[in-house]
Amino acid sequence: MKPWNVVLGVDVSKKTIDICWAEQKLSLHADNNSEGFGKFKKWCKDHSIDLSKTFIVLEYTGGYEYRFIQFCESQHIDYRRFPGLEIKNSRGMVRGKSDKADAFRISQYGEERVKRLEPSNPLNKDILELKTLLAFRKRLVRERAGYQNTVKERKHMYEVGDQDMIIAMAGAKIAANDEYTGDIEARIMELIKSDEKMYFNYQVITSIKGIGPINGWMTIAYTENFTSFPDARHYAVYVGVIPFDHRSGTSIKGRKRTSYLAQKELKQELNQAARIAILHSPEMRAYAERKLKNKDYKLILNNVKFKLILRMFSLVKRGEKYVENYRRAA
């Protein structure tokens, strides 16, 4: 592990960044742009902070942090992002809130864990663009569903035809969204095919019955092409498939349950994949039929989701496509 002399906490917003060195109680407020980053370098120089021996801790913000991360990579500064909820839950009782105070607490969080910190991998521009495209595709799909509901409700309530102005406009919006969605999906495939390893892994996981293009794209994006999770179980926890104990002392003896702290979008897509796998995979169908005799369907569905995750990670590790060789016993 690289020895870091300074751990800085950075609270990033759309227009500004707040930087704090909790150990020395030093702080800086700057713009989230090139001028602000230059101000940060000068501040470090004024306080004898060696950036080559500095570790920066910041939160995931959904995109506002990318410019600062690009600056860190250009200056060869080690950094790591953490979920905001993880840092928030580590603080204990907190009163009041400000960007400066948040930066101080982020720095404290990093200093307490400095011996266990590992730098993040450099940003992968293809993965970053893939996530952006998937997010925009999701927005288009939701808009389309909204316009479809408008058409359906209007026809039901007012008994109007396709010549109605609102229905015609909504129909035009739906057609435009379909065209844009097709363009987005074409760009996604173009992006995946441009990376040989990414495209091979995509072909591997979509060879599994139940894993279609959307699940394939999202799995590639959120596992960063199977590099950001050490194994299938860690990814299953992230998605919210692994059940955890719910018991304490003698009074609380609940059943194991999955956590609400999960990537809900991935879980939802895997839910659909599990249903399709049960329908079209003889092995999964036989498993579901056997377990339905004494298990709840939701539990079986969750188990199938975990099996699909295990298959994806196992096949990618071996570099092999899925081959259906299940034979049902007579």
Residue ranges and their predicted role:
Residues 2-22, 106:
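Gly/Thr-rich phosphate-binding beta-strand-loop-beta motif of the actin/hexokinase/Hsp70
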Residues 24-50, 55:
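Nucleic-acid-processing active sites and adjacent nucleic-acid-binding tracks
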Residues 52-64:
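Short glycine-rich phosphate-binding loop at a beta-alpha junction
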Residues 79, 84-204:
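Long, charge-rich intrinsically disordered scaffolds of nucleic-acid metabolism proteins
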Residues 99-110, 269, 273, 308, ...:
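Stable alpha-helical structural segments in soluble proteins, enriched in small hydrophobic residues
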Residues 113-118, 224-228, 276-283, 311-324:
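Short helix-capping/linker segments at secondary-structure and domain boundaries
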Residues 207, 213, 219-299:
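Phosphate-backbone recognition surface of nucleic-acid-processing proteins
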Residues 288-330:
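Low-complexity, acidic/Ser/Thr- and charged residue-rich accessory regions of DNA metabolism proteins
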